[in-house]
Every structure is written in C-alpha cells, then in structure tokens.
Design a protein with these regions (language model features):
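Nucleotide-sugar-dependent
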Residues: 29-54, 58, 66-74
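Short acidic-hydrophobic, aromatic-tinged amphipathic segments that line or gate anion-handling sites
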Residues: 7-10, 64, 75-85
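Short loop/helix-cap segments at secondary-structure boundaries that form the rim of catalytic
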Residues: 1-2, 69-74, 95
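Nucleotide-activated donor-binding/catalytic signature segment of Leloir-type glycosyltransferases, i.e.
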Residues: 1-26
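C-terminal accessory extensions appended to soluble enzyme cores
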Residues: 59, 69, 78-81, 103
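A short alpha->beta transition loop at the rim of the catalytic pocket in nucleotide-sugar-dependent
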Residues: 25, 60-61
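Structural motif corresponding to alpha-helix initiation and N-cap regions
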Residues: 11-15, 50, 101
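A charged, aromatic-enriched C-terminal amphipathic alpha-helix characteristic of glycosyltransferases
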Residues: 80-115
Length: 115
C-alpha cells in the first residue's frame, strides 16, 4: 500500500492547502482538548469548534479526532489505538446533509433556542 502523511509546521498559502485537502483520503486531527480565549477556558467540542470539521465538510473527507472529542457526525471517527488502525477504514458518508442551506438552518435553530 502507498501511504503517506503530509503535515506543515507553518501556515501555507490557501491554494496549496486546498490542493492537499483535495488529494487527501482522510484527515487526522490531533487537536488539543482545551485552550484559552481572553482568559476564558475553552473546550473543543463543547464551547469551541475545530475548523477541521469545516474542512472535512468542505472537502468531503473522513476525519479522525481524539476519542474524547464529542461529535454526532458520521464522518468524525474517534481515534482509538494507533493512527495506523484508521488508515484502512472504508466508510461511505453522505455529505449532502451538510449543504450550506442545511447548516444555516441548523445554526439558526440553535441560535434561536439560546435566545
């Protein structure tokens, strides 16, 4: 099997990022559990969303997230064991449920529920 992992240590131009995202089979997203924003503790998946989710939707890719990242999305795969365990996962996901219109409707519902 021809398997390679590509990562960057610094920000890359958008066209290069898009090119690699289009070529990718799966996204590995080893995000940190917690961060801080203006001295406020933020927890990814609860009070803060990872941009990796938007990338997975935009490019129609499966994404491996830390096991403790809460997600109901079928394209988010909880990381268990080693990364190698995920390289052979074949999973069909219908990304049409994440169209701009549907995401906007869900966002509006969430915002109005908070008011």
């Amino acid at each position: 099997e021809n398997i390679s992992i590509k990562y960057f240590t610094e920000k890359v131009p958008q066209d290069i990022f898009d090119d690699y995202m289009q070529k990718a089979d799966v996204l590995w997203c080893p995000i940190q559990q917690e961060t801080e924003f203006f001295s406020q503790k933020e927890i990814y998946g609860f009070t803060k969303m990872s941009g990796n989710i938007g990338d997975a939707v935009k490019f129609g890719k499966l994404a491996v997230f830390p096991e403790n990242y809460p997600s109901k999305y079928s394209f988010i795969i909880p990381e268990k064991g080693s990364l190698g365990d995920f390289l052979f996962i074949k999973k069909d996901v219908d990304f049409s449920e994440f169209s701009k219109e549907k995401v906007l409707q869900e966002l509006e519902k969430t915002i109005f529920a908070l008011l």
